[in-house]
């Protein structure tokens, strides 16, 4: 059983956490501001540079949402202080990525280039065959990285495509020729 929800979250210097009506939490920091509405049954307290999340009872739903809420608040605090970055790697001959303003243009072996405009709050940078997706909202950064990866998932036979940096692709054996 996880006990993540019981751990208090430390608030670093320069970060301000406010809990509004109906558990609407706003976190302000040097990189920006994030807000999210959490389950109103949970009790979120901000006391002396710490955030504590308490649940009203021990039902399985409350136990699950307790740990999730604590993790989401911790990610909001980390996002406004450090930010999040996901790196993608392009593997394959003729596969390239270029920046066109804020948008990214991908050439992935299709008959046409793919233009992708990132949502508000997410930045994309291209360095050679590496695409860096960064921002303060962990969910948005991960979603954009997954969307870019979906344009050309790694091929199971040769490994060509877009993959997360460090992702290991298990390659399948090709057809064996009979005698």
From Swiss-Prot:
Matches recorded under InterPro entries: Ribosomal_uL6-like, Ribosomal_uL6-like_a/b-dom_sf, Ribosomal_uL6_a/b-dom, Ribosomal_uL6_bac-type, Ribosomal_uL6_CS
Assigned GO CC terms: cytosolic large ribosomal subunit
Pfam families: Ribosomal_L6
Classification via PROSITE patterns: RIBOSOMAL_L6_1
GO MF annotation: an example: structural constituent of ribosome
GO biological process: cytoplasmic translation
Ribosomal protein is among the record's keywords: yes
Function: This protein binds to the 23S rRNA, and is important in its secondary structure. It is located near the subunit interface in the base of the L7/L12 stalk, and near the tRNA binding site of the peptidyltransferase center.
Family affiliation: Belongs to the universal ribosomal protein uL6 family.
NCBIfam families: L6_bact
SUBUNIT field: Part of the 50S ribosomal subunit.
Name recorded for this polypeptide: Large ribosomal subunit protein uL6
Species per Swiss-Prot/TrEMBL record: Persephonella marina (strain DSM 14350 / EX-H1)
Lineage: Bacteria, Pseudomonadati, Aquificota, Aquificia, Aquificales
